[in-house]
Amino acid sequence: MDLGAITKYSALHAKPNGLILQYGTAGFRTKAEHLDHVMFRMGLLAVLRSKQTKSTIGVMVTASHNPEEDNGVKLVDPLGEMLAPSWEEHATCLANAEEQDMQRVLIDISEKEAVNLQQDAFVVIGRDTRPSSEKLSQSVIDGVTVLGGQFHDYGLLTTPQLHYMVYCRNTGGRYGKATIEGYYQKLSKAFVELTKQASCSGDEYRSLKVDCANGIGALKLREMEHYFSQGLSVQLFNDGSKGKLNHLCGADFVKSHQKPPQGMEIKSNERCCSFDGDADRIVYYYHDADGHFHLIDGDKIATLISSFLKELLVEIGESLNIGVVQTAYANGSSTRYLEEVMKVPVYCTKTGVKHLHHKAQEFDIGVYFEANGHGTALFSTAVEMKIKQSAEQLEDKKRKAAKMLENIIDLFNQAAGDAISDMLVIEAILALKGLTVQQWDALYTDLPNRQLKVQVADRRVISTTDAERQAVTPPGLQEAINDLVKKYKLSRAFVRPSGTEDVVRVYAEADSQESADHLAHEVSLAVFQLAGGIGERPQPGF
């Protein structure tokens, strides 16, 4: 390790005084002008991680659904998954080190993780369309090269495409070709094969309006659309030509405001979807004949996908264990429908994609989606081999179902939640089942719910268990919540500390919006009283 060169280069990417950042679920995120030193240092860290794992590591420059003036960075581990927790700590430590401590921190990490510094390193880099992203990704490259790492800069990519590239490179091409054409071809081939088998390929299935959040999704969907155009025609809105990234558009805006994005005219019963800024989340929506807006979120996407997979397995005659993974935020109606109607087991984990992904890996087939529209399906290697064999060996009807499943497996991006891949999966399933967007929406009716935030002096006074559904501290809070829940039909409520600010998040659902609102307010008051609320007491009325 050439410590002199590192010190010299590090001075060119100096850390602003007093800036402290934390590597969270989404990596580092803050205002773009504060990130130059972090990018350089993540280039260094990616090289160490690559040497330690003897694998290609990814670095993605993006801040997803944050405003355009923000940026961020996250590292991608060898199988396309998120960075290992112990390395998240190293990332935080390295990003916050003062200039004079940089050498010591790098040596510490190398020793702690038994990194062989003679080992070759290879890093792949991708970035989104933010004005600051190109310069910041150059800082990552500086970090990689000063530590003697090799790199490939993919330039503009969606976040899930970078996860895919890393996965392909570390599986010797078995998962796919690690090029953008390889990605387009793999997904499109599977999609076109599937839609060929749809009996109802009328025009209403073939067109879709897509809000691209003025982000990278527009660029990549435009490059890709001619590959799958015989199965689907997409109309792109908020394509970045004039609007601002994530401003009044994108999956996050649509979900939180419960209304369509700016700049998209919707006729009644037209199928529409929105990506987020880096195209790893997707939500669907439509207007009914009365002009009412209907959102189809991650819960309903997971339900459509897992129901379809279950039906195919039954048809093939395979009894594989399939599981759906949700968080406490999943609507109670979706959980009931999956367990009682579809007889698919549902598991709950803590909030955060890495927890869901990890749990989903425990099943032959694991489907996970957060309500915000981030998710995918994972298939064990044994299942993939079994399905391939079935697609070649079984007789007609069973073979057709096995072939469908084989194509669906290829259509999923198993490295990460991917808006483009998920969109094609959903479109294929709707066409194959002959479902309209309203029929999909009508699988079950969401229970009315309300989410609130309560300001507290210190969010750490709240600790939870049972996948964040029960409060352990402060004493008496869970008992108070239990008593309040008993007052309303079909109700539940939970509280959890925010991961980023001193607030406590409250979720409540019940059989009517009025009851859900009352319950959420009463739980907020209990939090305010028992968990050190500050400022004004929570007021009723929304």
From Swiss-Prot:
Its EC number is 5.4.2.3. It catalyses: N-acetyl-alpha-D-glucosamine 1-phosphate = N-acetyl-D-glucosamine 6-phosphate. The lineage of its organism: Eukaryota, Metazoa, Chordata, Craniata, Vertebrata. This is Phosphoacetylglucosamine mutase. Gene3D superfamilies: Alpha-D-Glucose-1,6-Bisphosphate, subunit A, domain 3 (3.40.120.10), Alpha-D-phosphohexomutase, C-terminal domain (3.30.310.50). Pathway: Nucleotide-sugar biosynthesis; UDP-N-acetyl-alpha-D-glucosamine biosynthesis; N-acetyl-alpha-D-glucosamine 1-phosphate from alpha-D-glucosamine 6-phosphate (route I): step 2/2. GO terms for molecular function: magnesium ion binding; phosphoacetylglucosamine mutase activity. Changing S64A: Loss of activity. Changing E501Q: In IMD23; decreased phosphoacetylglucosamine mutase activity; no effect on protein abundance. It comes from Homo sapiens. Belongs to the phosphohexose mutase family. The modification Phosphoserine is found at S64.
